[in-house]
């Protein structure tokens, strides 16, 4: 059948248009669908911990930048004309074809890094001429849509490095126990050649071949004047990694909290200070060993920066609690009986209300309050006691009377405004036991409320004449991409619950508490710093607060 010339030209144009549209939309979006590990970093980007991806791979999210040494080694080994080619390298393809003809089998693919990114993004397929051609076409499309730097980062984030290790960052931590930015020339060269034969990293395999490939790359760098002779000689002396390193586990409960609550991202920059977090874990381990003698197997604490409300250290449970003692539970977020840890807030609110002054006398006598008979911890009564002394000694009876006079509903409302969201029931559910531990609160909420006491006082001292009460801030533990701390809790826009004057008097009173153990005679040393602190013991002696 003979078609008119116009028809043939029209069909040719349609075919070209269809081909162009296919080429335009040929790249998958997103290019990679594999899941990433959850990664937790401190405020300076130091790795605090990571959780394996859903498919069992250690695959960190692609990095924002690549270290110079690794990039230099990678391009020297894999793709020397990377910055000049359009996605495929005709010279490399021609050389690979000749090598394969001489060997009688496929010994070289001639793929550029861009082509390898395309291959990594697709499910494993047989290596054939048509697959290679398809990779070339998609590689040119990738070059048109991404910068060279982005392509390098895509490769570094998804290349296989042996076993279940994928990507440069995971490999750097697993094999050398350090971030990629700190890799030596020998380490960078090892990771640059490893994706070519990732199985060589395993003990028992032909690791001599891996060493030879690494050293050959180092000699090439020396020959190309990218490595000086001293660095070259030192690099040759470095051994290969003998075994995988465990990834850091400095804040596992915080990482799990992010993984469960924030699914839109996989890399979290926290407000934690890595050095302080390490010190906090060591402190927790020391106390854990001591507490085990008393059959106490769980502990938790947080460290706040008062001025900003940022969390600097977060220990969610005893480091070695294990499954036997529910070591996976984040005790920082677990509601527990408050004991007497809420008494300072009642003291401060009563001061603000003009109900008491520090020397005001409160009744400490046997009492029957609608069938409730409060008792002190030492099971005795002092008759009448100054409010300040009642707080210092944490007497129960005077504070029950103070709560009755101040108003149960009123105090319950104050606590809610201070951020105690765990008090989910109405005030009458707790009754006057609210100030003795009848309600459950979390360490997270307590840290925020006590931090608010100190922060308002700090702000007042910085500018007493221009002081304006600030909003209540829950502790902040997550940094935004810009480096500013984000508040993952609701901020209160209501007027301040406690005035600076009441906060000052409350904290000064709490300075007078007797310190435990070896710190009992701290005031005898001129270098000692004053601290305001409060303890609490829950019903049944299940929990101890400080």
Write out the residue ranges for each language-model feature:
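A penicillin-recognizing enzyme superfamily signal
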Residues: 270-291, 301-305, 314, 322-332, ...
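Short, well-structured active-site flanking segments
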Residues: 83-92, 166-169, 228-232, 325-328, ...
